[in-house]
Swiss-Prot record:
Modified-residue entries (N-acetylalanine), positions: 2
Pathway: Purine metabolism; IMP biosynthesis via salvage pathway; IMP from hypoxanthine: step 1/1
Organism: Bos taurus (Bovine)
Protein name: Hypoxanthine-guanine phosphoribosyltransferase
Major enzyme class: transferase
Length: 218
């Protein structure tokens, strides 16, 4: 079994960046504490993850499975980098995409009650190298549920790439194969990560403020 790819570890006392140093939509000005991971850093890290993925999975047809909705930005950017590597390689491989939607959050807590929406026919995964792309691993329960579903279809290989992984006492111990950033136990939004469907339109990963939580609470 291949070793997991290393990640960028962000410490518990990471101060982040002042909002005034970046372009933040005015309608979120009072709803955020700080910029936690700037967009440019996300993109550079994603480019390296693409290389790690191709090194480990690039010998066979890859099915990239996007976990909606939060994973769509990371998924699109990661696949752009993978496709660039693929078309410039002497040993390019076919790649197809599929989508599944999971829901496990109410407000800022993972409920543990995981709903699978879509993915009714995942028979196309049989015999393929499957790359599941997720925005964030919190407790890990959601991904364990999805992995059990995917493995029923007997793929050749299953790997998980997540932009973020939280250090949290609620974790069940699951760790993905490819991680962009390991972060403290803070509720983050932006770059398609949401709080009750808000904040997906932020370019950066930011820490939500108590004002923001109260304003957009379900």
């Amino acid at each position: 079994m291949a070793a997991r790819s290393p990640s960028v570890v962000i410490s518990d006392d990471e101060p982040g960046y002042d909002l005034n140093l970046f372009c933040i939509p005015n309608h979120y000005a009072e709803d955020l504490e700080k910029v936690f991971i700037p967009h440019g850093l996300i993109m550079d890290r994603t480019e390296r993850l693409a290389r790690d993925v191709m090194k480990e999975m690039g010998g066979h047809h890859i099915v990239a499975l996007c976990v909606l909705k939060g994973g769509y930005k990371f998924f699109a950017d990661l696949l752009d980098y993978i496709k660039a590597l693929n078309r410039n390689s002497d040993k390019s491989i076919p790649m197809t995409v599929d989508f599944i939607r999971l829901k496990s959050y109410c407000n800022d807590q993972s409920t543990g009650d995981i709903k699978v929406i879509g993915g009714d026919d995942l028979s196309t995964l049989t015999g393929k190298n499957v790359l599941i792309v997720e925005d964030i691993i919190d407790t890990g329960k959601t991904m364990q549920t999805l992995l059990a579903l995917v493995k029923k279809h007997k793929p050749k290989m299953v790997k998980v790439a997540s932009l973020l992984m939280k250090r949290t006492p609620r974790s069940v111990g699951y760790k993905p194969d490819f991680v962009g950033f390991e972060i403290p136990d803070k509720f983050v939004v932006g770059y398609a990560l949401d709080y009750n469907e808000y904040f997906r339109d932020l370019n950066h990963v930011c820490v939500i403020s108590e004002t923001g939580k109260a304003k957009y609470k379900a």
